[in-house]
Amino acid sequence: MSDNGATMLSSNRIANSFALVVALAGGAVCLGPARADGPSFDCRKASLPVEKAICADPRLSAIDALVAEAFTGFEPAFGGDKRKIARALIADRNACGQDAACIVSAQNNALQTYGNAPSWVQDYNIALIGKKALDTAARHPGSLDQPLPSSIGQCALTHITALTTRLGDDPLETAGPEAGSLARFSNGGAGVSYEREPGLASSKAGDPVVMCLISISRDCPQGDERGRVYYGVDLTIKGTWVLPDSQHLCGGA
């Protein structure tokens, strides 16, 4: 991952992916290639709920095969143990159970970590997690704040408390694009961008939001846990974003 979050999806890509949410809800969308030769493991021996979910879905199977392939060429950026990093990523995936949005988020995070994330996987990730975010809002209308998500694929309701430039010194609505963006939320979360984030540009303090954790950096210097990435949707204006919670990802300045 880049230091300033440049691996995040572009605003246009996010908007296009969000447009797929409605189609996904109706079961009328097909994204990207799906391999016919199954996942990286023997489905006859699948025992975990996540393994059974992957085996039952050709697209999840294709993504699993991509993860296994990407791992072979992976070299840790900070001298960490390659297999230890992989075990942490697999644990993230296994914790998802049969939740497809969670599984794809965890697998896309693994592909990002290994340096080989196809655009269709990223788009599929945002489409699924976007649908899950709206489903979360529908199940809890008018709900009070929920705790900041702590595991990949988890979503929670919250509210915007402040919208400023990246350094927090000016209101976002009157700032130029070069000043960046910083959103703070009532559950203690944040979203930071070096650019003027279109998904937040028309938002207001007090707007209800659903945040979903989609990435936890695993290839990091010891003790550096910066750079968790969240998908967010403003439930008032339906603006969306994908942003890290700090100016620098782990290993950065």
List each language-model region with its residue ranges:
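Cysteine-centric segments in proteins
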Residues: W120-A253
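Selective for proline/serine-rich intrinsically disordered segments
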Residues: T7-M8, L31, D37, D145, ...
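C-terminal segment of classical bacterial N-terminal signal peptides
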Residues: L24-A34
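N-terminal targeting/docking segments
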Residues: S2-G5, L31, G189-A190
